[in-house]
Amino acid sequence: MTDRRRPAHLSWSSIGIVAVGGAAGTGLRYAITLLVPRWGSVPIAIFGINVVGAFLLGALLELLADFSLDTGWSRRLRLGIGTGGLGGFTTYSALSTDTVTLAVTHPGRAIAYALGTVIIGAAASIAGIWLSRVQLRPSAGE
């Protein structure tokens, strides 16, 4: 089966784009976790990474929604930056592991960390969508 006949998620070029983006996002996340120390017992780097990633993903997908067709450069951008890059950058597994680790000694902080990450991440995603929709798109009269 040729690359053109496969569904987009099974094409080798799409898989490659996601893999490259994922490696870059994961590398960036790892570098940030090395550079940003914990804030007491709270893994602030992972919190920040997940919130920033949620904002960027909301903004990216809202911008790409304007182009309605998920083909060509729009698809490559979504796969490379969205699925790969931001998927590798953000981390639910580290959030889960950090929450369990924190719960051993500070259960209240663990609950606040987990809920705070999810709630603030959702708000950041909404803010990214809003920014793309209201601030970055040209108005209808332009």
State where each predicted segment sits.
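Membrane-interface helix-loop junctions in multi-pass transporters/channels
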Residues: 1-142
